[in-house]
Amino acid sequence: MARVTVQDAVEKIGNRFDLVLVAARRARQIQTGGKDALVPEENDKYTVIALREIEEGLITSQILDVRDRQEQQEQEAAEIQAVTAIAEGRR
């Protein structure tokens, strides 16, 4: 199944090299970043799940970039809020 998925996923991304980068990034997110898979896991490895998500059009490089930016902004806002709370507590 993974071989067929790779061929279909290449068509969605454009070339094999970008596919490797996007799939690895997404697989890492699922494995270590606490991100939930967007397709049923079906006892597949993280890389296969990432390829299936790409094949179905659920994940692209642009989608990952937007999500990363949103998470970074949320993290920065939380840090600012925490620093503000600490500063107000010292007054």
From Swiss-Prot:
InterPro entries in the record: DNA-dir_RNA_pol_omega, Pol_omega/Rpo6/RPB6, RPB6/omega-like_sf
Under the heading PANTHER family, the entry gives: DNA-DIRECTED RNA POLYMERASE SUBUNIT OMEGA (PTHR34476:SF1)
State the species of origin: Serratia proteamaculans (strain 568)
Q: Supply one GO CC term from the record.
A: DNA-directed RNA polymerase complex
**Functional summary from the UniProt entry:** Promotes RNA polymerase assembly. Latches the N- and C-terminal regions of the beta' subunit thereby facilitating its interaction with the beta and alpha subunits.
Kindly list the biological process annotations in GO that this record carries: DNA-templated transcription
Assembly and oligomerization: The RNAP catalytic core consists of 2 alpha, 1 beta, 1 beta' and 1 omega subunit. When a sigma factor is associated with the core the holoenzyme is formed, which can initiate transcription.
Task: Give the catalytic activity.
Answer: RNA(n) + a ribonucleoside 5'-triphosphate = RNA(n+1) + diphosphate
Alphabetical keyword list: DNA-directed RNA polymerase, Nucleotidyltransferase, Transcription, Transferase
- Superkingdom field: Bacteria
Encoding gene per record: rpoZ
Q: Does the keyword field hold Mitochondrion?
A: no
* Database matches in NCBIfam families: rpoZ (TIGR00690)
Q: What is its EC number?
A: 2.7.7.6
Record protein name field: DNA-directed RNA polymerase subunit omega
State any single GO MF term: DNA binding
| Keyword Manganese carried by entry | no
What family does the Swiss-Prot or TrEMBL record give for this protein? Belongs to the RNA polymerase subunit omega family.
